[in-house]
């Protein structure tokens, strides 16, 4: 279901789940920001942006899990991107963000950029989160199924990018395929994942 409003407490729970994710010995996205709190604050800004833009969905009214995605040809306009951009600048430094951008470029072409260049349609997932009180109860599968169902309906793949091997392994377990790995040096690694659509009986040819 589409999320139309959230309390600041609910937004913070998503930010905290990201900012304080246990990366073990991996680097994770916090390397691009000024620590765990700054990462959590940036994610809160991201959530506010996708909420304003109408891109945020949840598993139920209880909000166990959330997913933000955009359909083919959808654009994230200024009202979506402005809070996200402000969140980046408030929780990092311009120097660090520039270094992060250079590291991404050196890491190679992303799956999203490759598909854009090839003019292939896809659903792009920008955020997946299960609130900490609901983790380990199967909600990650349920939240991903929201985007997967859209991919099946439209006949297009679902793609996303994640910042930890442990997260990547979970996505693979839940039906996605690893489509590429990018070494960002001191900023860690990024993993491209894809899930191809399953054809419905109506779409199958005899």
Predicted regions and their residues:
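Conserved beta-hairpin
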Residues: 52-70
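Conserved acyl-donor/pantetheine-binding loop and adjacent beta-alpha core of acyl/acetyltransferases
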Residues: 66-128
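Conserved acetyl-CoA-binding loop-helix of GNAT-fold acetyltransferases
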Residues: 130, 136-149
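A short beta-loop-alpha structural element at the N-terminal edge
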Residues: 1-16
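Conserved GNAT acetyl-CoA-binding A-motif
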Residues: 122-123, 150-163
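Conserved active-site alpha-helix within GNAT-family acetyltransferase domains
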Residues: 141, 153-155, 164-181, 185
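Active-site rim helix/loop that mediates acceptor-substrate recognition in acyltransferases
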Residues: 33-56
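Conserved beta-strand-loop-alpha-helix junction that forms the acyl-donor binding cleft
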Residues: 126-135, 159-169, 186, 196
């Amino acid at each position: 279901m589409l999320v139309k409003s959230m309390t600041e407490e609910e937004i913070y729970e998503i930010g905290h789940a990201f900012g304080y994710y246990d990366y073990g010995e991996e680097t994770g996205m916090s390397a691009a920001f000024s620590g765990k709190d700054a990462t959590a604050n940036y994610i809160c800004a991201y959530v506010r942006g996708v909420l304003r833009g109408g891109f945020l969905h949840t598993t139920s009214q209880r909000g166990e899990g959330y997913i933000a995605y955009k359909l083919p040809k959808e654009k994230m306009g200024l009202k979506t991107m402005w809070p996200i951009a402000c969140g980046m600048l408030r929780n990092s430094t311009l120097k660090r963000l520039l270094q992060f951008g250079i590291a991404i470029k050196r890491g190679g072409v992303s799956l999203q950029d490759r598909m854009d260049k090839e003019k292939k349609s896809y659903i792009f997932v920008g955020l997946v989160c299960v609130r900490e009180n609901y983790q380990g109860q199967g909600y990650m599968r349920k939240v991903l199924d929201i985007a997967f169902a859209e991919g099946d309906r439209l006949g297009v793949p679902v793609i996303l990018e994640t910042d930890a091997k442990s997260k990547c392994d979970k996505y693979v377990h839940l039906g996605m395929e690893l489509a590429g790995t990018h070494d960002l040096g001191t900023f860690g690694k990024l993993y491209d994942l894809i899930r191809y659509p399953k054809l419905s009986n109506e779409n199958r040819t005899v």
